[in-house]
Amino acid sequence: MGWKGNRTPSNSQEGYYVGLMNACGYRTKDLEKPVIGIVNSFTDVNPGHRAFKELVGYVKEGVWAAGGTPAEFNVPAPCDGMAQGEGMHFILPSRDLIAGSIQAMASAHGFDGLVFLCSCDKIVPGMLMAAAALNKPCMFLTAGSMLPYEADEGTYVTPDLKESIGQRNIDAISEETFTRFRENICFSCGTCSMYGTANTMGVFAEVIGLCPIDSTTMLFCSSAKYKQARDVGERIVTLTKEGVRFSDVVTEASLKNGLRHVAATGGSTNAQLHICALARVMGIPMDLAAFDAIQRDVPCVAKFKPSSKFNMYDYYKAGGVGATMKAIERYLDPDARLATGGTVGEFLARFRRRVDPEIIHTADEPLYPDGCFAVLHGNLAPGGCIVKKSGVVPEMFHHRGPAVCFDSEDALRAAMTEKSVKPGDVLVIRYEGPKGGPGMREMSIPAAMLVGMGLHTSCAMVTDGRYSGATRGPCIGHVSPEAWDGGPIAAVRDGDMIEIDIDKHTIHLEVSDEELAERLGHIKRPAHPAPGVLGVYRKAVDSVNEGCTWLYGKEE
């Protein structure tokens, strides 16, 4: 049986559609081919997405060469790094907005297949959610990583710039050095060369089968990237003609493969939100407990900036994603399908790259035997919370200290700027959860400042908000229930002792149950306005444990 598209140009009922597409420069005979929507997240104001202005042309060439017709449209691509402070309220909500806008556009225009061009923190998961909701033939392509900055003192990448803010705050570096870092560390286009959320989710898209292997870790300017773009353009036409849909490639087994790989490589804690959200769109049950059970089942064999000295290009040169997949091969489902062709097992059987054992360990001699995350429970977080243990120094796996409370990230940042944080403190940042923020802001700059100020070996952070994927140190996030919903974190007072034990997976507020209940009865929420879309988000957002979806996952 021959291929049949979603639109039939020869049908007179499609005359209006054909006429309007002719107005865009398409010929009628072009519309008789597979029409491939190119979902482009190019923007001038996000280095991880700027390269798509050029790459999209190579994808289109591949589509035309394989007998398809490319049709490009664009979606927003906000940069987490730029959206600090007030702007950060909008970042996590933007994930579902991106997914919804793509679903609307692709459904309205009836594209036969889709290529998703994405790189950064909320754009990759937003596009994955859209792909799952649409269930069309699809492939993904990421832009590749940013060039490192080579200086006399060493090699620097983006997290070093964030940490230098803290260094400058205590005069550990000069204004001249800080200015040089600010103007040079972000050395080129491409995703920030660290294993933050962008690269965690980009690599996840590779392992679950939608994106060419090493698309994320290779340099954005590599000739291999342009070849990949053409290959993706050609391959999507084949998948479309063969009727291979998202659900034929990405199954529950694929999802678990991707999660295991995240845990094996020291990924971002934000992966918990995004993988649970994607699973929800796919109709697969997954919450924090299920996420933890899967990630604890695999050893952590690698970790990258800022949790180690190795950046994304080091990862690529050390063997890349194929090498880390090979290291945990026995934990992966070999029958999971790859959109590029074949299965995970077949790909790993062919894998022959040289592997650097200093960077990529074996499963028998791992960095950690049970994943890179620790999910903690206790009276401060009855619903759980999460920390990236692979980014915590061993001496901080257990910490007990007095609480210093802040009802917003802004208040914390002011205290750190004024240098009022003391060694031993447990910094409690609340009313920054999904509803309380609203938007579940990440404590990106404060966490980096903590490192830059040398306090990450003596202070801990605890929040119902979240952290940048490029965070290191004892930074516990996603505390549930959140303060806005009356969670125990709302009742913590300055000076209360908090004990954190990562090995035992516990977090305990040294206050009696009776005292805690009495305090919670007198809590008053602070004024955290929710204008426009944030008001809708506050009313609609689901639990952090299930991924903070707000446009997806509800029963209709």
Each language-model region and where it sits:
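A short, small-residue-rich loop immediately preceding and capping a beta-strand
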Residues: 106-127, 139-142
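Catalytic or ion-coupling anion/metal-binding cores of large enzyme and transporter domains
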Residues: 1-50, 55-77, 81, 85-91, ...
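Glycine-rich, highly charged phosphate/nucleotide-binding loops
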Residues: 91-100
